[in-house]
Regions:
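Core beta-strand elements of the Rossmann-like FAD/NAD(P) dinucleotide-binding domain
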Residues: 2-3, 188-196
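A conserved short coil-to-beta-strand element within the FAD-binding core of flavoproteins
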Residues: 150, 171-185
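Beta1/beta-strand and adjacent pyrophosphate-binding region of the FAD-binding site
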Residues: 1-11
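Active-site substrate-recognition segment that forms the wall
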Residues: 6, 16-23, 34, 45-46, ...
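Helix-loop-beta segment of a Rossmann-like dinucleotide-binding subdomain
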Residues: 83-94, 111, 118-168, 261-266, ...
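Dinucleotide-binding Rossmann-like beta1-alpha1 core, especially the glycine-rich loop
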Residues: 46-133, 283
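Short beta-strand to alpha-helix junction loop
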Residues: 61-65, 95-102, 144-160, 271-276, ...
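C-terminal catalytic lobe of FAD-dependent flavoproteins
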Residues: 290, 294-368
């Protein structure tokens, strides 16, 4: 029987779920995108979770599977007619100042490669070699190179997923939605009925659920980044994961994306802060001094969602089985988000999902 499935949230989770639901079924799928502050649309990401030193093994298992899922998703997008993919494996360089920290990181990569071949070749490079590898780089740090690390343009991926969704017969609406009575959604002057609904609205999840009497363990975090157009030959540069919060993502044609900030006290503020942008550019210029004299070509800002224990959650509400939720992905949303969206689509359609999602149950984060 044909069902009505609604997705609220056009970010990475919602757009992926919409793409796969419309690809794998004949149900009527509606995606509602508010279009304001979407973290993944504002983001460009390095996809390389294997060398993260976060200790939580559930988080690592999810993000490692998320990174591996990119290979399948790129195949599916190619099959859908995509000519230029937004994800490329050009490697990732993780910088450390002390030799013992580099060796520790390298060993971590070797250990994890036994169950994650996608890491690829691992190497330790000293500062002298790095300065030769990237001629514009100036550093006294060493780095570990993971050849399997990827880079991603978040906005380009969202556009492709939503284009594929529309080609599959999906309906895309814009606006701020609310849950109504008896399995309905209120969107401006429309009332839409659903059989199943996915709430993939990131930091805005409390706004939707709290009027129904739920308490949601989610807080917003502001993230800003900047772009600089250079004359560097960046096409085959690896992503640079610098000490602190700053990454440098190289794209074709000399474009460098720098960021992102992690601002916990700004709520849903989406104003560009010149001081924060300037500080990030200054930090990046310590490694690429030529950046100091180049103008900023573009800035972006979005709102991430975090839980109190920094783990994401996804699944359906125990007292309302027709309502599915996903939030709390934080700064690893581009890595884990597509895999989460794909899983929820499969479970809703009654297809197999071998991944154990029980550690990410919404029950401990959403109370009534």
């Amino acid at each position: 029987m044909k069902k009505d499935i609604i997705i609220i949230g056009g970010g990475i989770v919602g757009s992926t779920a919409a793409f796969y639901l419309s690809r794998e079924s004949k149900h009527h799928i509606t995606l509602i995108d508010m279009g304001i502050g979407t973290a993944s649309r504002a983001a460009a990401g390095i996809i390389c979770p294997w060398l993260s030193q976060r200790r939580n093994q559930d988080w690592y298992r999810l993000t490692a599977q998320g990174a591996a899922f990119y290979l399948q998703m790129m195949e599916d997008l190619t099959e859908a007619g995509t000519q230029k993919l937004p994800y490329q494996q050009k490697g990732s360089l993780i910088f450390k100042k002390k030799k013992n920290l580099l060796e520790k990181l390298y060993q971590l990569g070797l250990d994890r490669r036994e169950s994650a071949e996608m890491i690829g070749e691992l190497s330790i490079y000293d500062a002298q070699y790095l300065n030769q590898l990237i001629p514009n780089l100036v550093t006294d740090h060493g780095a570990v190179l993971a050849k399997g690390g990827g880079r991603l343009d978040g906005a380009a991926l969202l556009d492709l997923l939503q284009e594929g969704f529309l080609q599959n017969g999906g309906t895309l609406l814009h606006g701020r939605a609310q849950l109504g009575a008896k399995q309905t959604v209120l969107l401006e002057d429309q009332t839409l009925a659903y059989d199943q609904i996915i709430l993939a609205c990131g930091a805005w999840l409390p706004d939707i659920l709290e009027p129904l009497g739920y308490q949601v363990d989610i807080r917003p975090q502001k993230g800003q980044l900047l772009e600089v157009q250079t004359a560097f030959e960046t096409e085959n540069w690896p992503g640079l994961i610098l000490p602190g919060e700053i990454d440098i993502l190289p794209f074709e044609g000399g474009k460098l994306v720098i960021g992102a900030s992690h601002e916990n006290d700004k709520g849903f503020d989406l104003a560009i802060d010149p001081e924060v942008i300037g500080d990030m550019k200054k930090s990046a210029s310590q490694f690429l001094p030529d950046l100091a004299d180049l103008p900023i070509s573009k800035t972006r800002v979005g709102t991430r969602a975090y839980t109190s224990d920094f783990l994401p959650f996804y699944g359906n509400l125990k007292d309302r089985q027709s309502i599915w939720v996903a939030s709390g992905l934080g700064s690893s949303g581009l890595t884990s988000g597509p895999f989460i969206g794909w899983q929820m689509a499969r479970v809703i359609l009654g297809l197999t999902n071998p991944f154990d999602r029980s550690p990410f149950s919404p029950d401990q984060y959403i109370k009534k």
